[in-house]
Amino acid sequence: MDLIHLGIIRKALCAVLIVSCQLLIVNCSTRPDPAGVAAQAAKQYYDYLLEGKYEAFIDGQYRPDSIPGSYREQLIMNAKMFMGQQQREHRGIKETRIVNAEADTARHEANVFMVFCYGDSTTEEVLVPMVENKGIWYLR
């Protein structure tokens, strides 16, 4: 090979390397899918409920202002009663699954479609509306 061909090959390899690096940078700097993040947040909040972490479930609900402690306690009791009702009617919720999620980033909202798998082998698809506030997804 002569020097001209080596120069052309070297330039071609440099160009391929530069394009590869640019693609890598673009792929690494992309933001996570908002619908996917909202879906994972919804699942986590409902998993807290299944684990008996009622306070964490209630804290996952969006409220623009703080609430009195007595009202928070009522919400926690409501969550416990809901789980008791599910236990009586379906032998409890055993698992939650994400089916789909759609996000409207302009409005900072998402709809997460989940399936509740009950202890009596039945399932129920549930729509979980979510809202984003300061980069965190909350149950609406």
Regions found by a protein language model. Give the residues of each.
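A general boundary/transition motif marking the beginning of the first structured unit of a protein
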Residues: 1, 33, 45-46, 67-70
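Sterically constrained small-residue positions within well-ordered secondary structures
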Residues: 6, 12, 89, 103-105, ...
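Short, intrinsically disordered, low-complexity terminal segments
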Residues: 9-16, 35, 39, 98
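Short solvent-exposed beta->alpha transition segments
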Residues: 39-40, 54-105
